[in-house]
Amino acid sequence: MQLILLQKVTNLGNLGDLVDVKPGYGRNFLVPQGKAVPATESNKAEFEAKRAEYEAKAQAIHADAEGRKAKLEGASVTIAANASTEGKLYGSVGPRDIAEAFTAAGLPLEKSEVILGEGAFRNIGEYDVLVHLHADVETTVKVVVVAEA
């Protein structure tokens, strides 16, 4: 299935690229998410006519992500969770908990932007967490998990 990308897609291509993808990936993810359109002649002509508009939109999204990165750099948040005396958590701290803690601290973050390479945190301690804000914009934030008093 041939598609025209309407924005940069990680590991696939940039704005305006003509890409071949499996039909399910295109039909069920890229097209419904507004990341691509089928590569018909009419869509190609329409894309070329609106190319400047799409590029301006992509620049605005990238600039917004860069602004959010500047606010998040060096930021840290403390999350209190139930824990045993040995420091093991009863449960875990995952991306949703981290996103909610940053949002409560005035730094809006979506759970899908929080990348935990080794899974949820199950012990108290200090962790560095990767935040993926855009295809080209990533930063690291600090999360401190402490035992509830």
From Swiss-Prot:
Task: Give the CC-aspect GO terms.
Answer: ribonucleoprotein complex; ribosome
Transmembrane region positions? none
Which Gene3D superfamilies does its entry note? Ribosomal protein L9, C-terminal domain, Ribosomal protein L9, N-terminal domain
Q: Which GO terms describe its biological process?
A: translation
Superkingdom is Bacteria
For this UniProt entry, the molecular function terms from Gene Ontology, in alphabetical order, are: rRNA binding; structural constituent of ribosome
Alphabetical UniProt keywords: Ribonucleoprotein, Ribosomal protein, RNA-binding, rRNA-binding
- Matches recorded under PANTHER family: 50S RIBOSOMAL PROTEIN L9
Q: What does this protein do?
A: Binds to the 23S rRNA.
Q: Which family does it belong to?
A: Belongs to the bacterial ribosomal protein bL9 family.
Which HAMAP family did the record assign? Ribosomal_bL9 (MF_00503)
Which NCBIfam families does its entry note? L9 (TIGR00158)
The name this protein carries in UniProt is Large ribosomal subunit protein bL9
Gene symbol of the encoding locus:
rplI
